[in-house]
Amino acid sequence: MAKYKIAWLPGDGIGKDVLNAAKIVLDELKLDAEYIPGDIGWKFWCKEGNALPQRTIELLKKTDCSLFGAITSKPKEEAEAELDLSLKGKGYVYTSPIVKLRQLFNLRTNLRPCKAYPGNPLNYRDDIDLVVFRENTEDLYSGVEFHPLPKEVMDVLLKNHKSMKKFENTSLDDIAVSLRIVTRKACQNIVRDAFEYAKKHKRRSVTVVEKPNVIRETSGLMIREARKIAREYPGIPLWETNIDAMCMWLIKNPQDYDILVTSNMFGDIVSDLCAQLVGGLGFACSGNIGDDYAVFEPTHGSAPKYAGMNKVNPIATLLSVKLMLDWLSESQMATRLENAIATVIKEGKVRTYDMGGSSTTTQVAEEVARKL
């Protein structure tokens, strides 16, 4: 019986291509694991009205963690238009399966390392080593949205907040509302995770990234909790930066920053910016981590035009495997894998098209496997 059970979730588009690359490396590492395929993605939305079928949720409950490829996600109207004819008009509403997974399994911490590996021609600078901690279950991604705005909701808002007076005479059909929900507990958890990581890995600083000068209540709560928790880690300085200024400073002086911690939407934005500084989404790995379960994935999309072409850069996926190995306490394997990836990048002999080369997804994975 295998030591680990890992849910294998290719998803959409290039998801299968990059997970095939991951399997080449995992086989070479000889991780004692059983890989169990699960249904997830756009075709299941179209055929079943659910991109994350209940059978897949039950599968995940029986596994140690998941490795996830990529997902196609479309706006409400487009999603409804692509439903099977037999499902149309029956009240099905598309929800991103990865967002749903994060909430169902309380995968509260989104860990996104963005490190410049020497030899990567796409590096903005070679001395960038950032780690983004993004709260993963709340904020504008909580899914509490209204359109049109129900009259009873409008009445409550008008009664309780003077700023709603501006919209008093606007037709309810002309108002869309998405609630930014932030809880004290979630703020505490993500900030503490960031500081614990900084302590364990001997990092220089933690920067909390918010917008409390405008979004006073929700961003303000995050800032206040960050200040409290920072007192428990006197050797690690806490910096505070507004999200707009953070984007500017990351372009100007990315080497000055170390660990960034923020709420869900700001984290989604700033982590993609950080990824571009170290080569783009082809190098952007992530872990969605909870107390007893985790899902690891590259942060790129499904890139359907490249699906099945064996063309895309698998390094983001291979680095996600590295994060998975760390989480499984297979630290030696994780270090070997990262060193092999770094060597392949530095040598520059095997590169996919985004790096100016012509190697295939498989060839990059095989070269990494050889370096193991």
Where are these regions (language model features)?
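Glycine-rich phosphate/nucleotide-binding loop
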Residues: 54, 92, 247-349
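Flexible, glycine/charged-enriched surface loops at secondary-structure junctions
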Residues: 33-34, 201-210, 233-241, 330-338, ...
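N-terminal glycine-rich phosphate/adenylate-binding segment common to multiple enzyme folds
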Residues: 46-163, 177, 265
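Buried hydrophobic positions in well-ordered alpha/beta secondary-structure cores of metabolic enzymes
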Residues: 12-15, 64, 133, 194, ...
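Glycine-rich phosphate/diphosphate-binding loop of Rossmann-like nucleotide-binding domains
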Residues: 7-29, 155-241
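Buried hydrophobic packing segments
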Residues: 22, 26, 226, 317-325, ...
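N-terminal beta-loop-helix "entrance" segment that forms/cooperates
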Residues: 32-57, 250
